[in-house]
From Swiss-Prot:
Signal peptide from the UniProt entry: none
Gene3D superfamilies: 3.60.21.10
Catalytic activity: UDP-2-N,3-O-bis[(3R)-3-hydroxytetradecanoyl]-alpha-D-glucosamine + H2O = 2-N,3-O-bis[(3R)-3-hydroxytetradecanoyl]-alpha-D-glucosaminyl 1-phosphate + UMP + 2 H(+)
Species annotation: Shewanella sp. (strain MR-7)
Function according to Swiss-Prot or TrEMBL: Hydrolyzes the pyrophosphate bond of UDP-2,3-diacylglucosamine to yield 2,3-diacylglucosamine 1-phosphate (lipid X) and UMP by catalyzing the attack of water at the alpha-P atom. Involved in the biosynthesis of lipid A, a phosphorylated glycolipid that anchors the lipopolysaccharide to the outer membrane of the cell.
Entry GO MF terms: manganese ion binding; UDP-2,3-diacylglucosamine hydrolase activity
Binding-site residues for Mn(2+) 1, renumbered to this chain: 8, 10, 41, 196
Name of protein: UDP-2,3-diacylglucosamine hydrolase
Pfam families, A to Z: Metallophos
Gene: lpxH
Amino acid sequence: MRTLFIGDLHLSADRLDITQAFNRFLDTELDDADALYILGDLFEVWVGDDLAAPFALELARRLKQISQRLPIYFIHGNRDFMLGKQFADAAGMQILPEVTCLDLYGVNTVILHGDSMCTLDKAYQRFRKLRSFAFARWLYSCLPKRKRQAIADKIRSNSQSSNQQKSYVIMDVEPSAVDALFAQTHCKQMIHGHTHRPAIHNFTNGCKRIVVGDWYEQGSVLVVSADGVDLKSLPFDAS
């Protein structure tokens, strides 16, 4: 048996090839799986459950069917933090806390999206703090649909422009934040996404940090079993 972790698919109507690749993943990679964990940014943007695109609703129906035979867990990312209970229920997904600890085949493991550890990006962390307030999210949800979409498009555009000007270091997790989370949770293993830099980092103290990759050019999945971890790339070309 094995547990699968994915993240940063950034699904959108503009990149249906990624959705197709994800559907192939759902067809071929879930045999003997104990669970599927989606570590945020499943969608490129999410302005509200009431504005879900047709492709997202179709995907929800697919995930709902799969959830009848294995649990699907979801942690919010920085692009889909407005994804709510309505869509999660439709997709058969259980929304987990931002930082979640679990026992993975005897290894205490902390899982998260990962953006909270990019502490050198001060501007983003200010925005992240604002969006963490339930009142701010409620206020946004009360806006007309067109206004919500316009705000989301503006934030997305500003984020893409800003990221092009930020250094490699600022866009990565801060080592001190990683150390602090290990100390806070008393876990020996960490799994996250967000940075789009798939890797397995082994520490001298025996801890391990695993970063799942994005799905822009190829798929990425972390397979965890009693035998260890395997970070796999999944070519989009099904042939």
